[in-house]
């Protein structure tokens, strides 16, 4: 039933990419550190959503449910090598051979999820960053506003590209909205930080007045930093009991772009191609 959450969306440009989705399978054990799980959600299930939305590429993100066991990620990537890339989860004990195998499988980054904390901590960042840099990968971060503000000096000084998940959770802490926004803008001004326009319901609940403010922030980002924005569906929306309509969320972003075809192509095609090593 998972794919049925999608409605109908406006047309996307050719080679549009979903930069944040997950798969789940009962064939792989849930990590002892996991705080979130999901019913099975396969690549075949996702293909229904992908086709309906008009997407041709996707980025498979290792969910916290599997910790550092990236076997499902690698197996899934092997089925669509030209149109998919992966973001893995590793800890500081990872070997060069393991990193090389992930690289061959199509992995282009590692993720630190500090919201549903599990297998990794930010204390591992400095040890892993040189390996990431050597491979030409990036570091993807899921942080709450207070942690983003605290980590900002480290991220600004990082020698690797940084990708912030889920609108950087901009409006998730109302008392920190202004400081979070300023922190985000300063990081993006370095030219080394990307923002993922994914899961707006995690940045602010749809029934919260701040939800509209989130899209006002997005308009400002499009005007000033469109070359550092990518979009992701967050399918299959494991944090949500009532699943959102993927097409409705996508359409809202498309309306915000106000028929700016250059911005749309940047967010859905050109930027993902650069960040995730796709051919343009």
Task: State where each predicted segment sits.
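Mid-to-C-terminal alpha-helical segments outside catalytic/metal-binding sites
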Residues: 1-15, 39-57, 220-228, 242-280
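A generic "structured core" feature
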Residues: 16-17, 124, 128, 238
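Hydrophobic faces of well-ordered beta-strands that scaffold small-molecule active sites
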Residues: 17-21, 58-61, 84-88, 108-112, ...
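Conserved, mostly hydrophobic/aromatic
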Residues: 20, 73, 110, 132, ...
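Alpha-helical scaffold segments that flank or form the walls of functional sites
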Residues: 32-80
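Short, acidic/polar
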Residues: 40-48, 92-102, 179-180
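Active-site gating/metal-coordination segments in enzymes
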Residues: 67-153, 196-203
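Catalytic pocket-lining loop regions of alpha/beta-barrel enzymes
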Residues: 122-231
């Amino acid at each position: 039933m998972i794919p049925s959450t999608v409605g109908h969306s406006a047309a996307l440009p050719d080679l549009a990419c979903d930069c944040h989705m997950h798969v789940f399978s009962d064939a792989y054990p849930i990590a002892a550190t996991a705080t979130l799980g999901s019913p099975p959600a396969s690549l075949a299930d996702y293909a229904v959503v992908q086709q309906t939305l008009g997407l041709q590429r996707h980025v498979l993100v290792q969910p916290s449910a599997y910790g550092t066991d990236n076997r499902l990620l690698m197996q899934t990537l092997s089925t669509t090598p030209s149109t998919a890339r992966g973001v893995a989860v590793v800890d500081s004990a990872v070997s060069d051979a393991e990193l090389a195998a992930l690289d061959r499988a199509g992995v282009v980054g590692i993720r630190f999820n500090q919201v549903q904390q599990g297998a990794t901590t930010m204390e591992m960042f400095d040890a892993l960053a040189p390996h990431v840099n050597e491979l030409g990968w990036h570091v993807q971060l899921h942080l709450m506003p207070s942690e983003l503000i605290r980590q900002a000096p480290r991220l600004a000084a990082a020698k690797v590209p940084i990708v912030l998940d889920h609108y950087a959770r901009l409006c998730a802490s109302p008392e920190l909205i202004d400081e979070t926004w300023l922190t985000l803008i300063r990081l993006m001004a370095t030219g080394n930080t990307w923002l993922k326009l994914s899961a707006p319901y995690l940045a602010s609940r749809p029934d919260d007045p701040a939800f509209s403010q989130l899209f006002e922030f997005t308009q400002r980002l499009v005007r000033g930093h469109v070359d550092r924005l990518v979009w992701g569906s967050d399918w299959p929306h494991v944090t949500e009991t009532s699943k959102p309509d993927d097409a409705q969320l996508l359409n809202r972003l498309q309306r915000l772009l106000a028929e700016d075809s250059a911005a749309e192509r940047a967010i859905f095609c050109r930027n993902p191609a650069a960040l995730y090593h796709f051919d343009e």
